[in-house]
UniProtKB/Swiss-Prot annotation:
Membrane topology (UniProt): Single-pass membrane protein
Pfam families reported in the protein's UniProt record: PSI_8
Record-level GO BP terms: photosynthesis
Gene for this chain: psaI
Keyword check for ATP-binding: no
Keyword Phosphoprotein tagged: no
Keyword terms, alphabetized: Chloroplast, Membrane, Photosynthesis, Photosystem I, Plastid, Thylakoid, Transmembrane, Transmembrane helix
TM helices/strands, residue ranges: 10-30
Localization annotation: Plastid, Chloroplast thylakoid membrane
Protein name: Photosystem I reaction center subunit VIII
Lineage: Eukaryota, Viridiplantae, Streptophyta, Embryophyta, Tracheophyta
Record's function text: May help in the organization of the PsaL subunit.
GO cellular component: chloroplast thylakoid membrane; photosystem I; plastid
Family to which this protein belongs: Belongs to the PsaI family.
């Protein structure tokens, strides 16, 4: 019966962690391939 606590954990996870991983992976991709 703890489903009401799921969004309060899941929203910051998607809103902060996912963009951080996406930015980090994009940065590493650019550094690896020397696009810039």
């Amino acid at each position: 019966m703890m489903d009401f606590n799921l969004p309060s954990i899941f929203v910051p996870l998607v809103g902060l962690v996912f963009p951080a991983i996406a930015m980090a992976s994009l940065f590493l991709y650019v550094q690896k391939n020397k696009i810039v």
